[in-house]
Amino acid sequence: MLYQSDDIHLIYAGGTFGSHGTPLSPLPAHEFLPVLQNLLNSRLDSRQVILDNDRIKDSSTLTPADFTHFYELIRTAHQQGARRFVLITGTDTLSFLASFLSHAFADSDLSLVITGSMNPLLVADNPAYHIDDTSDAWHNLSDAINVSQTRQGVFVQFCHQTFWADNTQKIDSLNPNAFYGTHVSHPSLTFPTIRPEPFDIIKHHANTANIKSIFLLPNDTNHIVQELANINDNTTAVILIAYGVGNLPKSDAIIAELDRLHGQNIPVVCTTMCPFHGVSTTYAAGSWQYAHHVWSGGKLSIPAIYGRLLWLAVNNALSSDNW
């Protein structure tokens, strides 16, 4: 099938945007998409094509295999002529997926805008599927479509803000202004370019990917040692979520575990539980770890780190040189 480069190619992946009922759950495609298509036809002049997608779910259940599914769906449509994409997904893992896709299409000539909503497009308790004009859903979608027509790259569009997709984070569980990131008015981050492997290899690695996290709490240092000791060979990488600018307790046992993980080629990336400004080597309480092969998360959010690690892992490129 060939696509027109000027058309907007929509992918509906579920989430609050297309949810309905009490409690909310994503509507199946055969019920929701005709309603969405009619709305688009009545309110927009541009032509939209809804791509076939069988992965419609609450975003809290997305896995690496789902991430690579969306990569392949977009890549295939791009090979057939499509250049403008809008992906509607749930907000829980939107930033994780956006980061992954931003690296996947870093050097592509497409426009890909990832969006969602904090409230459903439809009135939740009305069985007639009426549009809720007080919801943020339509505003986010129409803004995303506009961005796909005017910018090239991979973006997150939310609450009238356009962010580079490689480094965003959901910072509010209720309000429409739920995301934070690097606005497109500022330069985007730069990363080493990774040439994608054939999709069968990417798919294989996604099925076995296992990125773990350790969230520090003010417990006895031995608890950190035990959590590190529990990391085994089937782990792809570890995200160490530390205090402040990346501070964490230091002990001989922790150092030994960090050295062990390095010897097993399991990267450990340090980030912060703080939502803004990332980690640094300002304090001795955190800088010591980098002498023991820990990678710095820099100013990347936790979802941004996950997305970058996963893209490197599925392409056999998980190394400090590529980080």
Predicted regions and their residues:
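Active-site histidine-anchored catalytic micro-motif
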Residues: 2-323
